């Protein structure tokens, strides 16, 4: 069963409040249980006097790839200073400075951090920066514009948080792509 965070709370009159429902959040891939929960929340808002209307974020499909390219590029750049000398974890046993750097990063960073550093380094490398990083920045700006437009007549947007219902902690860690796809509605 889905969580009921507002259960037992006294609700107030929401007359005059407009909430937007981004149409692109309710397409293929959204679990029926999640859809029903969001529609129930919209119904509750309507019942309290809020106006709920559809809005559009046509570039939403670009949000997730743009987010991962930009955040990975930033992580790659920011974590470059974690060398075990001045910043970050320091390996205990090493023969020289190169080994200190290598071991400190091997031991100090988890698999996901290493994955993001590699993706970010690739996205920022010469020959690929225009193809990935700069396009991701353009997509982010387009999404920002669309979100501002959608919020122009709304106090808030109501959308699912993730396509499937929540799974137990540690349940999907073996499939990074599935974990990444779970962020689709939270990155814009």
Predicted regions and their residues:
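Flexible, acidic loop-helix segments that line cofactor/substrate-binding pockets
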Residues: 17-18, 22-25, 55-68, 97, ...
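An alpha-helix initiation/capping motif
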Residues: 35-39, 61, 137, 141
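Solvent-exposed alpha-helices and their adjacent loops that cap or buttress functional pockets
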Residues: 11-14, 20, 60, 109-111, ...
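Acidic-enriched catalytic cores of C-N bond-cleaving enzymes acting on peptides and small amides
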Residues: 1-4, 28-58, 80, 88-91
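Residue-level marker of alpha-helix boundaries and capping positions
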Residues: 29-33, 66, 176-179
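A short helix-breaking turn/cap at a secondary-structure junction
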Residues: 1-37, 41, 98-103
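Glycine-rich, small-residue loops and helix-cap segments
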Residues: 44-47, 51-52, 71, 77, ...
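Flexible loop/turn segments at secondary-structure boundaries
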Residues: 26-30, 61-63, 125-126, 165-168
């Amino acid at each position: 069963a889905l969580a009921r965070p507002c259960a037992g709370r006294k609700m107030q009159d929401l007359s005059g409040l407009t909430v937007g429902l981004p149409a692109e959040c309710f397409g293929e891939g959204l679990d029926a249980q999640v859809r029903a929960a969001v529609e129930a929340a919209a119904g509750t808002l309507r019942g309290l006097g809020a106006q709920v209307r559809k809005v559009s974020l046509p570039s939403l499909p670009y949000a997730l790839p743009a987010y991962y390219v930009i955040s990975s590029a930033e992580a790659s750049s920011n974590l470059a200073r974690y060398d075990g000398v001045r910043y970050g974890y320091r390996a205990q046993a090493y023969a020289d400075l190169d080994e200190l750097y290598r071991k400190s990063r091997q031991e100090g960073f988890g698999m996901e951090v290493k994955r993001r550093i590699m993706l970010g380094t690739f996205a920022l490398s010469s020959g690929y920066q225009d193809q990935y990083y700069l396009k991701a920045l353009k997509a982010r700006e387009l999404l920002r514009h669309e979100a501002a437009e959608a919020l122009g007549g709304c106090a808030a947007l109501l959308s699912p948080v993730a396509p499937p219902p929540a799974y137990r902690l540690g349940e999907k860690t073996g499939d990074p792509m599935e974990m990444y796809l779970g962020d689709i509605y939270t990155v814009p």
